[in-house]
Amino acid sequence: MKKSIAGFTLIELMIALALGTIVTAAALMLFISGQRDIALQQASADIQSSGNFGLGFITKDIRLANLDAANTLLKKDTIYGGVVIATSNYPQSMQQAVSGKNVFSSSIGSTSNVKDPSNTSINSAQLVIQFKAQNDGFNCEGKAYTAGNYIVERYFLREDTGAGNEPNKPLGLACEATSYVDGGNAFNDTNFGSGSGQLIIRRVDYFHVLLNVSNDNNDVFKYLDINNYASDSTNLHINAVQIGLLVRSNDGLGSNNLRADQQYQVLNQSVVVNTDSNIKTPFLRKVIQQTVALRNAGLGISDTVTAAGGQ
């Protein structure tokens, strides 16, 4: 007697194939979702490491600004003033050497990848600080300096020449540094103000700086950008520097939740990132801000000292 052989019916086979397809699709979706989560976490890590840690490196030197200045009340005419606004912040012996050079803080000092909500391009700021070195050390470019010299550091945005195919301009926050001796008439690096410096924070679309200022009675405090402070006739004194950065991830994300027209608030400035039609991959961006109190600026307490090699 022949044994009957049972097999799949056509309907059972179709159901099995359908279930297999569903399971495979679910596994594929989990894999894609996991990859996106990994990319998002990596992008966040990029911003945390380059942004927050880099900002900490910068603020360490900014806190030294105004060290051994002619007056602890930091103003735009303070000799050896920690935030360099005008030629009067340099000693008389240096003023001819710095005249006409890019060695001053400015609200429109360098390039950016942003515009305001009305579609007008906005430049990034430039911050120049100086302080007297109390000990031998290294400046923001990693170059050694000697105790007793005045150290000058310039923070600005520039393009990363080693970048690949990236959206807009691959900008980063760089620092260029030099020094001068007390009573000297030139920087140790005569090209200071035109060099490329050392990149500190990669992929910064916008750099903005505000100054916390007050009058001599310390009853009016406000924030001004550098150019408005420079043009203010009341010669307010500077108490703190507020820094704002729009930092982006190094790599793009496969996410549709990131809008190209998103507005970012960087201190008192609303900005929108310039769009690049050649790049379809979105990037994660984050605003990083920090206020640095200038410990050597006296916070409104005048304590004039004799400036060696001054006016």
Which role does the model predict for each range below?
Residues K2-L67, D303:
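Aliphatic-rich helix starts adjacent to a transmembrane/signal segment
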Residues Q41, G54-G244, N250-L284, Q289, ...:
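N-terminal pilin/flagellin-like segments and related low-complexity appendage regions
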